[in-house]
């Protein structure tokens, strides 16, 4: 006979206690008889009822003992039958274990392949980020070069404008120089004419001086002739005077002298008048020639000064023009070099972008292929799970039929139930959708090591349920079970404004916390945003990564509820997580309640989600 179970021992202890409680109290011996009160009557009735219950309990204990004896006999027969059926079940069990080992091997290979693909995807994403950073850096350098080219173009345009202004000034100065040269030519012509007139006047003066000298000589000659004639006349007079009377000689000498004096005075007056007129004419012509010559000299000197200044200005403008031309040529060469460099960089960037796009296309194709293979493996896994469940049911049926004890192997049951209802999509793009997703995880503990701990004489586990719903285009895609982040996703093909929207979190019946988006925040179509708590140590990088600086954790517990509320206070998305504990028996036969501990596992990710990583196979 097998020893009684702890449950039976407790049942046996309870009747003894009840019997002890039901023992009647002794009355007072030899006391006088008194009329019974209602309280006394009720106590007597209760004693009678307790006595009957004790009798029934004793009968029940006898019955239980008889049943235990019968049970021991049946257990002996079962043990005999087990020896017989063990040989029959060994073949099925070996086949089941081989298929189970194959399924485990396939799942392990799938997990390893998936981990390898995740590592490759991470490397490719890191390379893509580096390429994007390099492209952004090159784009910044290209923008700086384009700005430099624009500055040089503006400088070149200013140089062209200054060159055009200098050329116009040069043309104006050239016209001024031409006019000055024409005036100078006219002045030189006038100067030549004045010189010619001066030469003529000089010749005339010389001619007049010669004529004056000839007239003076002629006058001297005539004077000498006249004096000779006077002397001759005097000699004749003297000869006549010899004959004339001496009285008349004095009168005649006086008249002679008077006539000679008058003739001399008239001749002197004529010579003086002629000389004065000649001098006045010569002086007037000489003054006129000098004045004209002075004017011509002044005009020529002024023209020479203006010509000199024009030449100096022309030389200065020529120097400036040559400098501007050199600057313009240097700017053109620099612009040409920058354009060539920019064209080379543009071609290089275009080739790099084409190569990266080709690589990204190949990566997408590889990822799609790997996702397809992963989906096929998941389908195979689901099929294997179904077959394993079928084998398990068959084994359980055989065990029940043959009355065998179930094997203490760990098992995990994962059930998914999703239901979605989508409304009509109108021409304006309005999307009405509500979905609910429920995920349950149940993991009983066996005799071997498991996630929760180890045990040899009992079984236990935990139950984790997660529900999600969304009535709009934005859903709560993922939440961290350790309270590090909450992730939202825009499932539509249009941008969604999240201005003044709030994410609320309530753990058990505690205080509700809320994160509020900025008034201008917009979630792009098909994009996700992750709101991290400050204690996660993640850097703030909008618009995809936001940090809640005023909260160190989103909070966690046995159950918590996360809600997305729009600006009008309406709930548009919700996700709840509930964690329940299970009961297990220890070696002493006592039931203990154990709370399940869980971390951030990827049991809640959808099929094909690339965020999941290989954490080990918990299915088998």
Swiss-Prot record:
Domain spans labelled LTD: 462-579
Location of the region described as Coil 2 in the Swiss-Prot/TrEMBL record: 257-400
Biased composition (Acidic residues): 588-601
GO biological process: heterochromatin formation; nuclear envelope organization; nuclear migration; nuclear pore localization; protein localization to nuclear envelope
Biased composition (Low complexity): 404-431, 444-453
Region annotation (Linker 1) ranges: 84-95
Positions carrying Omega-N-methylarginine: 433
Motif Nuclear localization signal in this chain: 435-440
Cysteine methyl ester: residues carrying this PTM: 617
Propeptide: 618-620
Keyword Coiled coil: yes
S-S bonds: none
Region described as Tail: spans on this chain: 401-620
Domain annotation IF rod: ranges: 46-402
Compartments in which it is found: Nucleus lamina
Coiled coil: none
Broad class of where this protein is predominantly found: nucleus
Keyword Disulfide bond: no
Positions of glycan attachment: 413
Covalently lipidated residues, kind S-farnesyl cysteine: 617
Location of region: Disordered: 1-38, 399-464, 581-620
Subunit structure: Dimer. Lamin dimers then assemble into dimeric head-to-tail polymers. Ultimately, two head-to-tail polymers assemble laterally into a protofilament with a uniformly shaped rod of 3.5 nm in diameter. Interacts with TMEM43.
Disease: Partial acquired lipodystrophy: A rare childhood disease characterized by loss of subcutaneous fat from the face and trunk. Fat deposition on the pelvic girdle and lower limbs is normal or excessive. Most frequently, onset between 5 and 15 years of age. Most affected subjects are females and some show no other abnormality, but many develop glomerulonephritis, diabetes mellitus, hyperlipidemia, and complement deficiency. Intellectual disability in some cases. APLD is a sporadic disorder of unknown etiology. Epilepsy, progressive myoclonic 9: A form of progressive myoclonic epilepsy, a clinically and genetically heterogeneous group of disorders defined by the combination of action and reflex myoclonus, other types of epileptic seizures, and progressive neurodegeneration and neurocognitive impairment. EPM9 is an autosomal recessive form characterized by myoclonus, tonic-clonic seizures, ataxia, and delayed psychomotor development.
Annotated function: Lamins are intermediate filament proteins that assemble into a filamentous meshwork, and which constitute the major components of the nuclear lamina, a fibrous layer on the nucleoplasmic side of the inner nuclear membrane. Lamins provide a framework for the nuclear envelope, bridging the nuclear envelope and chromatin, thereby playing an important role in nuclear assembly, chromatin organization, nuclear membrane and telomere dynamics.
Family classification: Belongs to the intermediate filament family.
Protein name: Lamin-B2
Native organism taxonomy: Eukaryota, Metazoa, Chordata, Craniata, Vertebrata
């Amino acid at each position: 006979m097998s020893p009684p179970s702890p449950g039976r021992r407790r049942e046996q202890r309870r009747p003894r206690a009840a019997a002890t409680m039901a023992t009647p109290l002794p009355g007072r011996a030899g006391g006088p008889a008194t009329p019974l009160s209602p309280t006394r009557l009720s106590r007597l009735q209760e004693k009678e009822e307790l006595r009957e219950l004790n009798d029934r309990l004793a009968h029940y204990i006898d019955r239980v003992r008889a049943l235990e004896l019968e049970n021991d006999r049946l257990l002996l027969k079962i043990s005999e039958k087990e020896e017989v059926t063990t040989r029959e079940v060994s073949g099925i069990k070996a086949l089941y274990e081989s298929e189970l080992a194959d399924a485990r091997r396939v799942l392990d290979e799938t997990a390893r392949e998936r981990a390898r693909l995740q590592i490759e995807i991470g490397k490719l994403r890191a390379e893509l980020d580096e390429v994007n950073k390099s492209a952004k850096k090159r784009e910044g350098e290209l923008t700086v070069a384009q700005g430099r080219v624009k500055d040089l173009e503006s400088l070149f345009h200013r140089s062209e404008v200054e060159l055009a202004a200098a050329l116009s000034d040069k043309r104006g100065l050239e016209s001024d120089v031409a006019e000055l040269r024409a005036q100078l030519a006219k002045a030189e012509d006038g100067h030549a004419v004045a010189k010619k007139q001066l030469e003529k006047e000089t010749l005339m003066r010389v001619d007049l001086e010669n004529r004056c000298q000839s007239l003076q000589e002629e006058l001297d000659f005539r004077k000498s002739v006249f004096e000779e004639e006077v002397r001759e006349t005097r000699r004749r007079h003297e000869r006549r005077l010899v004959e004339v009377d001496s009285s008349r000689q004095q009168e005649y000498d006086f008249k002679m002298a008077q006539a000679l004096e008058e003739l001399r005075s008239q001749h002197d007056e004529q010579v003086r008048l002629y000389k004065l007129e000649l001098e006045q004419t010569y002086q007037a012509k000489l003054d006129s020639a000098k004045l004209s010559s002075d004017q011509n000299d002044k005009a020529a000197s002024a023209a020479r000064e203006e010509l000199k200044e024009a030449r100096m200005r022309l030389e200065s403008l020529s120097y400036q023009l040559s400098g501007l031309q050199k600057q313009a040529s240097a700017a053109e060469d620099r612009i040409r070099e920058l354009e060539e460099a920019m064209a080379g960089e543009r071609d290089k960037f275009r080739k790099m972008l084409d190569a990266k796009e080709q690589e990204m296309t190949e990566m997408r194709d590889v990822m799609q292929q790997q996702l397809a293979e992963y989906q096929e493996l998941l389908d195979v896994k689901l099929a294997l799970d179904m077959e394993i469940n079928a084998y398990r049911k068959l084994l359980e049926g055989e065990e029940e039929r043959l009355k065998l004890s179930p094997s203490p192997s760990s098992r995990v049951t994962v059930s998914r139930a999703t239901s979605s209802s989508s409304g009509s999509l109108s021409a304006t793009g309005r999307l009405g959708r509500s979905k609910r997703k429920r995920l349950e995880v149940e993991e009983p503990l066996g005799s071997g090591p498991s996630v929760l701990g180890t045990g040899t004489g009992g079984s236990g586990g935990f139950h984790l349920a997660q529900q999600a719903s969304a009535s709009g285009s934005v859903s709560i895609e993922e939440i961290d079970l350790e309270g590090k982040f909450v992730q939202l996703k825009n499932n539509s093909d249009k941008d969604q404004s999240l201005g003044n929207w709030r994410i609320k979190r309530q753990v058990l019946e505690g205080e509700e916390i809320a994160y509020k988006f900025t008034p201008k925040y917009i979630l792009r179509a098909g994009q996700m945003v992750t709101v991290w708590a400050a204690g996660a140590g993640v850097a703030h990088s909008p618009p995809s990564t936001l940090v809640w600086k005023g909260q160190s954790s989103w909070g966690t517990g046995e159950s918590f509820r996360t809600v997305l509320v729009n600006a009008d206070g309406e709930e548009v998305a919700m996700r709840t997580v509930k964690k329940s504990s299970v009961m297990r028996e220890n070696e002493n036969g006592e039931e203990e309640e154990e709370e399940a501990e869980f971390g951030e596992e990827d049991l809640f990710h959808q099929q094909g989600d690339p965020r999941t990583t290989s954490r080990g196979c918990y299915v088998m």
